[in-house]
A protein has these predicted regions:
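Conserved P-loop
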Residues: 1-73, 126-130, 135
Length: 138
């Protein structure tokens, strides 16, 4: 399952993400991963959660990002949840590219039984309507 936390900058997306990470970490019988761009969430995320600063891995663009997510799922079958903050800063602000990325992530999440949640910094009206065929609103 793919979920999107959508809203403009300052609308509380990261707070929702942090709360969801905490809840998933407590409920999960496996591992929870949180991906961020930069070290902003270090003190907000539970220590049991695997916090990954994607800048340390040279990931730029949606193709590299998809490969990175595949590696996480392939490398550890116990991952139950992946949370991603600042999705558009990792991939790009091109909403068409975001749609194609989400189309690829959905089968990955289903095959690996992993819930993947992204924050997307924009108005929902800016996104292609088709994106909700592949992801649900958080």
């Amino acid at each position: 399952m793919v979920k999107l936390i959508i809203g403009r900058k300052g609308s509380g997306k990261t707070k929702k993400l942090i709360d969801a990470v905490k809840a998933a970490t407590e409920a999960s019988n496996g591992n929870v991963v949180c991906i961020e761009k930069g070290p902003a969430l270090t003190y907000d995320i539970p220590h049991k959660t695997r916090l990954v600063n994607i800048e340390n891995f040279g990931v730029v663009g949606y193709d590299a990002f998809y490969g990175f997510l595949c590696g996480i799922c392939a490398g550890n079958y116990d991952v139950t949840d992946i949370f991603v903050d600042a999705t558009l800063r990792i991939g790009s602000r091109d909403y068409g590219e975001l749609l194609e990325f989400i189309k690829k992530v959905k089968p990955l999440s289903e095959d690996s039984n992993t819930v993947v949640t992204f924050t997307v910094s924009c108005d929902e009206s800016e996104l292609p309507a088709e994106i909700f065929d592949f992801a649900e609103r958080f």
